Amino acid sequence: MVLTYKYLECNRKIYTNIKSLVIPDRDIVYFEKIDDIVCNIEMDRIFIIDEISKKYTKECKQDKLFYSWLQQSRKRRRTVLLITQEYLQVPIWLRGVARFVYTTTKLPVLPIFVTYKGYAVLNDDKEWTIEPEVTYIYKRNKYICDFYDTMEPINTL
């Protein structure tokens, strides 16, 4: 995931279920479950929700409260980052709310990564693909990688 300057503005409080996330000089609030944040009506906040596919599987029914909360994000100037390694397992009702989708791959030999920012669309074979809008090519930055433990298990939502 590539975060632009807008996401790093120091006055934006961050809510996350990633307990190991520590960013110097940032106000971070940790939560356990989606139910802990759906009543949050604060303006101009960042919500980072890891392993969203553990809470909402491909066949699950729509969570109307969470869906409504997501739809209100634009009006409340919220940035919501839903993280999953199983994009195809996220239900369609949740994919439809996404404004952008980021997908990252590592180049085979070099320690270089490519992240595509784009829109998820169904191709002719009914497979989800990303229509790239922007491409980021980068080498991982140890400073950023040290913000959280990428191996931290997220067991509840």
Over which residues does each language-model region extend?
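Short, structured coil segments at secondary-structure junctions
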Residues: 10, 24, 96-98
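Glycine-rich P-loop/Walker A and Walker A-like loops and their local beta1-loop-alpha1 context
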Residues: 1-9
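Conserved proline-anchored active-site loop of SAM-dependent methyltransferases
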Residues: 48-50
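Short glycine-rich substrate-engagement loop in P-loop NTPases that contacts/grips substrate
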Residues: 15-43
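A generic local structural motif
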Residues: 1-2, 31-36, 65-68, 87-89
